[in-house]
Amino acid sequence: MNVINETANVLKLETGSVTSAKGFSAVGIHTGVKRKRKDLGAIVCEVPASSAAVYTLNKVQAAPLKVTQESIAVEGKLQAMIVNSGIANACTGKRGLDDAYTMRAVGAETFHIPEHYVAVTSTGVIGEFLPMDVITNGIRQLKPEATIEGAHAFNEAILTTDTVEKHTCYQTIVNGKTVTVGGVAKGSGMIHPNMATMLSFVTTDANIDHGHLQGALSAITNETFNRITVDGDTSTNDMVVVMASGLAENEALTPEHPDWANFYKALQLACEDLAKQIARDGEGATKLIEVEVTGAANDQEAGMVAKQIVGSDLVKTAIYGADANWGRIICAIGYSGCEVNQETIDIAIGPIVTLKQSEPTGFSEEEATAYLKEADPVKISVNLHIGNGTGKAWGCDLTYDYVRINAGYRT
Protein backbone atom coordinates (compact mmCIF):
# COMPACT_ATOMS: atom_id res chain seq x y z
CA MET A 1 0.00 0.00 0.00
CA ASN A 2 1.24 3.49 -0.82
CA VAL A 3 0.53 6.31 1.63
CA ILE A 4 0.59 9.97 0.61
CA ASN A 5 1.99 12.47 3.08
CA GLU A 6 -0.42 15.36 2.77
CA THR A 7 2.03 17.98 4.01
CA ALA A 8 4.53 17.55 1.17
CA ASN A 9 4.84 16.19 -2.35
CA VAL A 10 6.03 12.87 -0.96
CA LEU A 11 4.72 9.33 -1.40
CA LYS A 12 5.53 6.52 1.03
CA LEU A 13 6.13 3.08 -0.50
CA GLU A 14 5.25 0.52 2.14
CA THR A 15 7.23 -2.27 0.44
CA GLY A 16 10.30 -0.25 -0.55
CA SER A 17 13.77 -0.33 0.93
CA VAL A 18 17.44 0.33 0.30
CA THR A 19 17.33 -1.27 -3.17
CA SER A 20 14.37 0.77 -4.43
CA ALA A 21 16.40 3.74 -5.69
CA LYS A 22 17.92 3.32 -9.15
CA GLY A 23 21.36 1.78 -9.23
CA PHE A 24 21.46 0.01 -5.86
CA SER A 25 21.70 -3.66 -4.94
CA ALA A 26 22.22 -5.42 -1.61
CA VAL A 27 23.09 -8.78 -0.09
CA GLY A 28 23.42 -10.48 3.28
CA ILE A 29 24.92 -13.87 4.13
CA HIS A 30 25.88 -16.07 7.08
CA THR A 31 29.65 -16.56 7.46
CA GLY A 32 29.93 -18.05 10.93
CA VAL A 33 30.73 -14.95 12.99
CA LYS A 34 27.29 -15.51 14.51
CA ARG A 35 26.03 -18.97 15.34
CA LYS A 36 23.06 -19.04 12.98
CA ARG A 37 21.94 -15.63 11.73
CA LYS A 38 23.29 -13.67 8.79
CA ASP A 39 26.30 -11.58 9.78
CA LEU A 40 27.84 -9.98 6.68
CA GLY A 41 26.26 -7.75 4.06
CA ALA A 42 26.86 -5.09 1.45
CA ILE A 43 25.11 -2.32 -0.44
CA VAL A 44 26.58 -1.68 -3.88
CA CYS A 45 25.88 1.06 -6.43
CA GLU A 46 26.30 0.74 -10.20
CA VAL A 47 28.14 4.07 -10.27
CA PRO A 48 30.19 6.13 -7.80
CA ALA A 49 27.55 7.77 -5.59
CA SER A 50 27.75 11.13 -3.86
CA SER A 51 27.89 10.22 -0.19
CA ALA A 52 27.54 11.77 3.24
CA ALA A 53 27.80 10.39 6.74
CA VAL A 54 27.27 11.31 10.37
CA TYR A 55 29.21 9.45 13.06
CA THR A 56 29.02 8.68 16.77
CA LEU A 57 30.26 11.44 19.07
CA ASN A 58 31.57 8.87 21.53
CA LYS A 59 35.25 9.75 21.99
CA VAL A 60 36.11 6.05 21.82
CA GLN A 61 35.46 5.26 18.17
CA ALA A 62 35.78 1.92 16.40
CA ALA A 63 38.33 1.33 13.64
CA PRO A 64 35.80 1.09 10.77
CA LEU A 65 34.66 4.67 11.36
CA LYS A 66 38.16 5.97 10.62
CA VAL A 67 38.32 3.94 7.40
CA THR A 68 34.89 5.11 6.23
CA GLN A 69 35.73 8.74 7.02
CA GLU A 70 38.93 8.43 4.99
CA SER A 71 37.09 6.88 2.04
CA ILE A 72 34.45 9.61 1.83
CA ALA A 73 37.08 12.34 2.27
CA VAL A 74 38.82 11.44 -1.01
CA GLU A 75 36.05 12.39 -3.47
CA GLY A 76 32.86 12.56 -1.42
CA LYS A 77 31.73 9.38 -3.16
CA LEU A 78 31.17 5.71 -2.34
CA GLN A 79 30.19 2.71 -4.41
CA ALA A 80 30.05 -0.05 -1.80
CA MET A 81 29.20 -0.29 1.90
CA ILE A 82 30.33 -3.47 3.68
CA VAL A 83 28.95 -4.30 7.14
CA ASN A 84 29.51 -7.15 9.57
CA SER A 85 27.58 -7.84 12.76
CA GLY A 86 28.43 -9.86 15.85
CA ILE A 87 31.81 -8.21 16.51
CA ALA A 88 32.23 -4.42 16.69
CA ASN A 89 35.98 -4.19 15.94
CA ALA A 90 36.16 -1.50 18.63
CA CYS A 91 38.99 -1.09 21.15
CA THR A 92 41.11 -3.46 19.06
CA GLY A 93 44.14 -1.22 18.45
CA LYS A 94 46.35 -1.35 15.37
CA ARG A 95 45.24 -4.88 14.54
CA GLY A 96 41.62 -3.77 14.43
CA LEU A 97 42.45 -0.83 12.17
CA ASP A 98 44.44 -3.09 9.86
CA ASP A 99 41.49 -5.48 9.75
CA ALA A 100 39.16 -2.64 8.72
CA TYR A 101 41.55 -1.64 5.94
CA THR A 102 41.67 -5.28 4.84
CA MET A 103 37.87 -5.41 4.66
CA ARG A 104 37.98 -2.32 2.45
CA ALA A 105 40.70 -3.75 0.19
CA VAL A 106 38.95 -7.09 -0.26
CA GLY A 107 35.68 -5.30 -0.96
CA ALA A 108 37.34 -3.19 -3.65
CA GLU A 109 38.81 -6.30 -5.23
CA THR A 110 35.49 -8.16 -5.09
CA PHE A 111 33.42 -5.36 -6.62
CA HIS A 112 36.17 -4.15 -9.01
CA ILE A 113 36.25 -0.58 -7.73
CA PRO A 114 38.90 1.70 -6.18
CA GLU A 115 39.47 1.24 -2.45
CA HIS A 116 38.35 4.78 -1.60
CA TYR A 117 34.91 3.96 -3.01
CA VAL A 118 34.44 1.34 -0.28
CA ALA A 119 33.19 2.07 3.26
CA VAL A 120 33.13 -0.45 6.09
CA THR A 121 31.47 -0.71 9.45
CA SER A 122 30.98 -3.28 12.19
CA THR A 123 28.53 -3.76 15.04
CA GLY A 124 28.44 -6.18 17.95
CA VAL A 125 30.58 -7.04 20.96
CA ILE A 126 33.32 -4.52 21.82
CA GLY A 127 36.90 -5.70 22.41
CA GLU A 128 36.95 -8.83 20.26
CA PHE A 129 38.98 -9.30 17.09
CA LEU A 130 37.34 -10.12 13.78
CA PRO A 131 38.01 -13.64 12.42
CA MET A 132 39.51 -12.23 9.25
CA ASP A 133 39.70 -15.49 7.29
CA VAL A 134 35.95 -15.84 7.76
CA ILE A 135 35.28 -12.17 6.96
CA THR A 136 37.45 -11.97 3.83
CA ASN A 137 36.11 -15.25 2.45
CA GLY A 138 32.61 -13.97 3.13
CA ILE A 139 33.20 -10.67 1.32
CA ARG A 140 34.36 -12.56 -1.76
CA GLN A 141 31.07 -14.50 -1.73
CA LEU A 142 28.84 -11.41 -1.71
CA LYS A 143 26.58 -11.21 -4.76
CA PRO A 144 24.28 -8.18 -4.41
CA GLU A 145 20.81 -8.16 -5.99
CA ALA A 146 18.68 -5.17 -6.96
CA THR A 147 15.63 -6.76 -5.29
CA ILE A 148 13.60 -6.36 -2.12
CA GLU A 149 14.91 -9.80 -1.13
CA GLY A 150 18.45 -8.44 -1.30
CA ALA A 151 17.44 -5.54 0.93
CA HIS A 152 15.90 -7.87 3.51
CA ALA A 153 18.96 -10.13 3.48
CA PHE A 154 21.21 -7.11 4.06
CA ASN A 155 19.05 -5.82 6.90
CA GLU A 156 19.07 -9.22 8.58
CA ALA A 157 22.86 -9.32 8.30
CA ILE A 158 23.37 -6.08 10.26
CA LEU A 159 21.05 -6.84 13.20
CA THR A 160 22.24 -7.58 16.74
CA THR A 161 19.61 -7.61 19.52
CA ASP A 162 16.96 -6.23 17.17
CA THR A 163 13.70 -8.17 17.06
CA VAL A 164 12.54 -6.85 13.67
CA GLU A 165 14.02 -5.53 10.44
CA LYS A 166 13.72 -1.81 9.76
CA HIS A 167 12.99 -0.57 6.23
CA THR A 168 11.64 2.64 4.74
CA CYS A 169 11.06 4.18 1.32
CA TYR A 170 9.68 7.49 0.01
CA GLN A 171 9.34 9.03 -3.43
CA THR A 172 9.03 12.61 -4.60
CA ILE A 173 9.26 14.63 -7.81
CA VAL A 174 12.27 16.74 -8.80
CA ASN A 175 12.24 18.45 -12.23
CA GLY A 176 9.45 16.11 -13.26
CA LYS A 177 11.64 13.09 -12.43
CA THR A 178 10.71 10.52 -9.80
CA VAL A 179 13.30 10.53 -7.02
CA THR A 180 13.38 7.64 -4.55
CA VAL A 181 14.81 7.63 -1.02
CA GLY A 182 15.04 4.23 0.66
CA GLY A 183 16.81 2.90 3.70
CA VAL A 184 17.42 0.28 6.36
CA ALA A 185 18.59 0.49 9.95
CA LYS A 186 19.62 -1.55 12.94
CA GLY A 187 19.41 -0.57 16.55
CA SER A 188 17.70 -1.79 19.68
CA GLY A 189 19.91 -1.11 22.70
CA MET A 190 22.69 1.35 23.59
CA ILE A 191 20.62 4.02 21.83
CA HIS A 192 21.18 7.62 22.85
CA PRO A 193 22.52 9.34 19.75
CA ASN A 194 24.68 11.82 19.03
CA MET A 195 24.95 9.12 16.84
CA ALA A 196 24.56 6.06 19.01
CA THR A 197 24.16 2.46 18.77
CA MET A 198 22.57 2.33 15.50
CA LEU A 199 23.49 1.94 11.89
CA SER A 200 21.38 3.44 9.14
CA PHE A 201 22.00 3.24 5.43
CA VAL A 202 19.97 5.41 3.08
CA THR A 203 20.10 5.34 -0.71
CA THR A 204 18.65 7.74 -3.25
CA ASP A 205 18.85 8.18 -7.00
CA ALA A 206 18.75 11.97 -6.66
CA ASN A 207 21.42 13.99 -8.42
CA ILE A 208 23.11 15.92 -5.60
CA ASP A 209 26.73 16.61 -4.71
CA HIS A 210 28.52 15.58 -1.52
CA GLY A 211 28.47 19.00 0.11
CA HIS A 212 24.75 19.64 -0.20
CA LEU A 213 23.95 16.04 0.74
CA GLN A 214 26.14 16.33 3.84
CA GLY A 215 24.43 19.56 4.85
CA ALA A 216 20.99 18.03 4.51
CA LEU A 217 21.93 14.84 6.37
CA SER A 218 23.57 16.70 9.26
CA ALA A 219 20.52 18.92 9.76
CA ILE A 220 18.06 16.05 9.45
CA THR A 221 20.05 13.82 11.82
CA ASN A 222 19.68 16.43 14.56
CA GLU A 223 15.90 16.31 14.09
CA THR A 224 15.54 12.53 13.83
CA PHE A 225 18.25 10.06 14.87
CA ASN A 226 19.59 12.41 17.53
CA ARG A 227 16.09 12.66 19.02
CA ILE A 228 15.74 9.00 19.98
CA THR A 229 16.80 7.26 23.16
CA VAL A 230 16.37 3.77 24.57
CA ASP A 231 18.82 3.50 27.44
CA GLY A 232 21.07 6.58 27.51
CA ASP A 233 24.19 4.75 26.28
CA THR A 234 26.14 6.12 23.30
CA SER A 235 27.99 3.56 21.17
CA THR A 236 31.50 3.43 19.74
CA ASN A 237 30.62 2.35 16.22
CA ASP A 238 27.58 3.77 14.70
CA MET A 239 26.73 6.00 11.84
CA VAL A 240 24.24 7.11 9.24
CA VAL A 241 25.38 6.95 5.62
CA VAL A 242 23.52 8.30 2.58
CA MET A 243 24.51 7.38 -0.98
CA ALA A 244 23.08 9.24 -4.01
CA SER A 245 23.49 7.59 -7.42
CA GLY A 246 22.20 10.50 -9.50
CA LEU A 247 20.42 8.05 -11.82
CA ALA A 248 17.08 9.85 -11.49
CA GLU A 249 18.74 12.38 -13.84
CA ASN A 250 17.22 15.45 -12.23
CA GLU A 251 19.01 18.78 -12.37
CA ALA A 252 21.59 18.90 -9.58
CA LEU A 253 19.92 19.65 -6.27
CA THR A 254 20.95 22.65 -4.19
CA PRO A 255 19.03 24.56 -1.51
CA GLU A 256 18.14 27.09 -4.23
CA HIS A 257 16.57 24.41 -6.46
CA PRO A 258 12.76 24.88 -6.74
CA ASP A 259 12.22 21.24 -5.72
CA TRP A 260 14.78 21.19 -2.90
CA ALA A 261 11.97 21.09 -0.32
CA ASN A 262 10.56 17.93 -1.90
CA PHE A 263 13.88 16.09 -1.70
CA TYR A 264 14.66 17.37 1.79
CA LYS A 265 11.23 16.27 3.04
CA ALA A 266 11.61 12.80 1.54
CA LEU A 267 15.02 12.36 3.18
CA GLN A 268 13.70 13.74 6.47
CA LEU A 269 10.69 11.41 6.48
CA ALA A 270 12.88 8.40 5.67
CA CYS A 271 15.24 9.21 8.55
CA GLU A 272 12.39 9.93 10.96
CA ASP A 273 10.68 6.68 10.02
CA LEU A 274 13.85 4.66 10.66
CA ALA A 275 14.52 6.52 13.92
CA LYS A 276 11.03 5.74 15.21
CA GLN A 277 11.38 2.09 14.21
CA ILE A 278 14.62 1.90 16.22
CA ALA A 279 12.97 3.46 19.26
CA ARG A 280 9.96 1.15 18.95
CA ASP A 281 12.28 -1.87 18.86
CA GLY A 282 14.14 -0.89 22.03
CA GLU A 283 15.35 -3.92 23.93
CA GLY A 284 12.42 -5.40 25.83
CA ALA A 285 10.12 -2.55 24.81
CA THR A 286 6.38 -2.98 24.42
CA LYS A 287 5.55 0.40 22.89
CA LEU A 288 6.86 3.57 21.31
CA ILE A 289 6.74 6.88 23.20
CA GLU A 290 6.50 10.17 21.29
CA VAL A 291 6.99 13.45 23.14
CA GLU A 292 6.11 16.75 21.48
CA VAL A 293 7.10 20.03 23.11
CA THR A 294 5.71 23.40 22.03
CA GLY A 295 6.06 26.89 23.42
CA ALA A 296 9.79 26.54 24.16
CA ALA A 297 12.28 29.40 23.86
CA ASN A 298 13.46 27.93 20.54
CA ASP A 299 13.40 24.69 18.55
CA GLN A 300 16.67 23.45 20.03
CA GLU A 301 15.40 23.78 23.59
CA ALA A 302 12.10 22.15 22.64
CA GLY A 303 14.01 19.14 21.32
CA MET A 304 16.17 19.02 24.44
CA VAL A 305 13.14 19.03 26.74
CA ALA A 306 11.41 16.35 24.66
CA LYS A 307 14.46 14.11 24.73
CA GLN A 308 14.92 14.62 28.47
CA ILE A 309 11.35 13.46 29.08
CA VAL A 310 11.50 10.44 26.81
CA GLY A 311 14.89 9.46 28.25
CA SER A 312 13.74 9.50 31.88
CA ASP A 313 13.77 6.00 33.34
CA LEU A 314 10.98 7.02 35.70
CA VAL A 315 8.80 8.20 32.80
CA LYS A 316 9.60 5.06 30.81
CA THR A 317 8.71 2.72 33.68
CA ALA A 318 5.52 4.67 34.38
CA ILE A 319 4.47 4.17 30.76
CA TYR A 320 5.20 0.45 31.04
CA GLY A 321 3.09 0.29 34.20
CA ALA A 322 0.26 2.34 32.63
CA ASP A 323 0.69 4.91 35.39
CA ALA A 324 -0.18 8.49 34.37
CA ASN A 325 2.39 9.92 36.76
CA TRP A 326 2.75 13.39 35.27
CA GLY A 327 4.97 14.40 38.20
CA ARG A 328 7.80 12.44 36.58
CA ILE A 329 7.28 14.37 33.36
CA ILE A 330 7.39 17.80 34.98
CA CYS A 331 10.44 16.71 36.97
CA ALA A 332 12.27 15.88 33.72
CA ILE A 333 11.22 19.24 32.28
CA GLY A 334 12.67 21.00 35.31
CA TYR A 335 16.12 19.39 35.08
CA SER A 336 16.37 19.69 31.29
CA GLY A 337 18.56 22.78 31.60
CA CYS A 338 16.21 24.74 29.34
CA GLU A 339 14.23 27.89 30.04
CA VAL A 340 11.09 27.01 31.99
CA ASN A 341 8.43 28.99 33.83
CA GLN A 342 7.14 26.64 36.51
CA GLU A 343 3.78 28.44 36.56
CA THR A 344 2.85 28.08 32.87
CA ILE A 345 3.38 24.40 31.98
CA ASP A 346 0.69 22.28 30.28
CA ILE A 347 1.01 18.48 30.08
CA ALA A 348 -1.23 16.01 28.27
CA ILE A 349 -0.92 12.24 28.05
CA GLY A 350 -2.64 11.38 24.81
CA PRO A 351 -5.94 13.31 24.80
CA ILE A 352 -5.99 13.61 28.58
CA VAL A 353 -4.85 16.96 29.98
CA THR A 354 -3.16 16.25 33.31
CA LEU A 355 -1.69 19.69 34.04
CA LYS A 356 -2.88 23.15 32.94
CA GLN A 357 -0.83 26.25 33.71
CA SER A 358 1.10 24.09 36.19
CA GLU A 359 -2.03 23.09 38.12
CA PRO A 360 -3.52 19.56 38.27
CA THR A 361 -6.73 19.15 36.28
CA GLY A 362 -8.41 16.40 38.27
CA PHE A 363 -8.36 14.07 35.26
CA SER A 364 -9.80 10.56 35.28
CA GLU A 365 -7.10 8.09 36.34
CA GLU A 366 -9.17 5.29 34.82
CA GLU A 367 -9.24 6.98 31.41
CA ALA A 368 -5.52 7.70 31.59
CA THR A 369 -4.71 4.10 32.53
CA ALA A 370 -6.87 2.78 29.70
CA TYR A 371 -5.09 5.08 27.23
CA LEU A 372 -1.63 3.99 28.40
CA LYS A 373 -2.55 0.31 28.14
CA GLU A 374 -4.01 0.59 24.65
CA ALA A 375 -2.02 3.33 22.89
CA ASP A 376 1.01 2.63 20.70
CA PRO A 377 2.61 5.05 20.32
CA VAL A 378 1.96 6.73 23.64
CA LYS A 379 1.94 10.48 22.99
CA ILE A 380 2.97 13.05 25.57
CA SER A 381 2.39 16.73 24.79
CA VAL A 382 3.98 19.62 26.67
CA ASN A 383 3.43 23.36 26.19
CA LEU A 384 5.91 25.55 28.07
CA HIS A 385 4.29 28.87 27.07
CA ILE A 386 7.71 30.55 26.81
CA GLY A 387 8.18 31.13 23.06
CA ASN A 388 7.54 29.55 19.66
CA GLY A 389 10.00 26.64 19.77
CA THR A 390 8.75 23.16 18.86
CA GLY A 391 10.41 19.75 18.90
CA LYS A 392 9.83 16.02 19.13
CA ALA A 393 11.69 13.03 20.54
CA TRP A 394 11.05 9.30 20.54
CA GLY A 395 11.79 6.46 22.91
CA CYS A 396 10.22 3.37 24.42
CA ASP A 397 9.03 2.00 27.71
CA LEU A 398 11.47 0.29 30.09
CA THR A 399 10.61 -3.28 31.03
CA TYR A 400 11.99 -6.25 32.97
CA ASP A 401 13.12 -7.75 29.66
CA TYR A 402 15.65 -4.95 29.09
CA VAL A 403 17.63 -6.22 32.09
CA ARG A 404 17.25 -9.85 31.01
CA ILE A 405 18.48 -9.17 27.48
CA ASN A 406 21.51 -7.12 28.53
CA ALA A 407 22.49 -9.33 31.46
CA GLY A 408 23.02 -12.16 28.98
CA TYR A 409 24.25 -10.25 25.91
CA ARG A 410 27.54 -12.16 25.52
CA THR A 411 26.21 -15.56 26.58
From Swiss-Prot:
Residues flagged as site, Cleavage: 196-197
Record pathway: Amino-acid biosynthesis; L-arginine biosynthesis; L-ornithine and N-acetyl-L-glutamate from L-glutamate and N(2)-acetyl-L-ornithine (cyclic): step 1/1; Amino-acid biosynthesis; L-arginine biosynthesis; N(2)-acetyl-L-ornithine from L-glutamate: step 1/4
Keyword Ligase attached: no
Catalytic function, reaction form: N(2)-acetyl-L-ornithine + L-glutamate = N-acetyl-L-glutamate + L-ornithine; L-glutamate + acetyl-CoA = N-acetyl-L-glutamate + CoA + H(+)
Keyword Metal-binding: no
GO (cellular component) term, any one: cytoplasm
Residues that bind substrate: 160, 186, 197, 283, 406, 411
Pfam families tied to this protein: ArgJ
One GO BP annotation of this record: L-arginine biosynthetic process
Site entry: Involved in the stabilization of negative charge on the oxyanion by the formation of the oxyanion hole: 123-124
Keyword line: Acyltransferase, Amino-acid biosynthesis, Arginine biosynthesis, Autocatalytic cleavage, Cytoplasm, Multifunctional enzyme, Transferase
Subcellular location(s) per record: Cytoplasm
Catalytic machinery residues: 197
Regulation of activity: Feedback inhibition by L-ornithine.
Enzyme Commission number, as recorded: 2.3.1.35, 2.3.1.1
InterPro entries listed in its UniProt record: Arg_biosynth_ArgJ (IPR002813), ArgJ-like_dom_sf (IPR016117), ArgJ_beta_C (IPR042195)
One GO molecular-function entry: glutamate N-acetyltransferase activity
Family to which this protein belongs: Belongs to the ArgJ family.
Subunit structure: Heterotetramer of two alpha and two beta chains.
Function: Catalyzes two activities which are involved in the cyclic version of arginine biosynthesis: the synthesis of N-acetylglutamate from glutamate and acetyl-CoA as the acetyl donor, and of ornithine by transacetylation between N(2)-acetylornithine and glutamate.
NCBIfam families linked to this entry: ArgJ, PRK05388.1
Record-given protein name: Arginine biosynthesis bifunctional protein ArgJ
